[in-house]
Amino acid sequence: SALTGAGGTHLCGSHLVEALYVVCGDRGFFYTPSKTGIVEQCCHRKCSIYDMENYCN
C-alpha cells in the first residue's frame, strides 16, 4: 500500500479520500478540497500517515 512507512507519498483526489478512510477509520475526517490544506500537503507535496491523522475528526 502507498501508506506504508512515514516517508510520505503523493495522494490526490479519490486516492487521498481513500487513504483518509483507512487512516481515520471510525473517527471519520473532514475533507474540503476547496480549502488547500490537505490537498496542498498531500497532493502537491508529500504527506505521511501522521500528517493525515491531523485531518481526522
From Swiss-Prot:
Keyword Signal: no
SMART domains reported for this sequence: IlGF
Annotated transmembrane regions: none
GO cellular component assignments: extracellular space
Keywords, alphabetical: Carbohydrate metabolism, Disulfide bond, Glucose metabolism, Hormone, Secreted
Single GO MF descriptor: hormone activity
Compartmental location: Secreted
Entry-linked InterPro entries: Insulin, Insulin-like, Insulin-like_sf, Insulin_CS, Insulin_family
GO biological process: glucose metabolic process
Main location: secreted
Record CDD domains: IlGF_insulin_like (cd04367)
Disulfide bridge map: C12-C43, C24-C56, C42-C47
Family: Belongs to the insulin family.
The protein's role, per its UniProt record: Insulin decreases blood glucose concentration. It increases cell permeability to monosaccharides, amino acids and fatty acids. It accelerates glycolysis, the pentose phosphate cycle, and glycogen synthesis in liver.
Subunit structure: Heterodimer of a B chain and an A chain linked by two disulfide bonds.
Protein name: Insulin
Originating organism: Petromyzon marinus
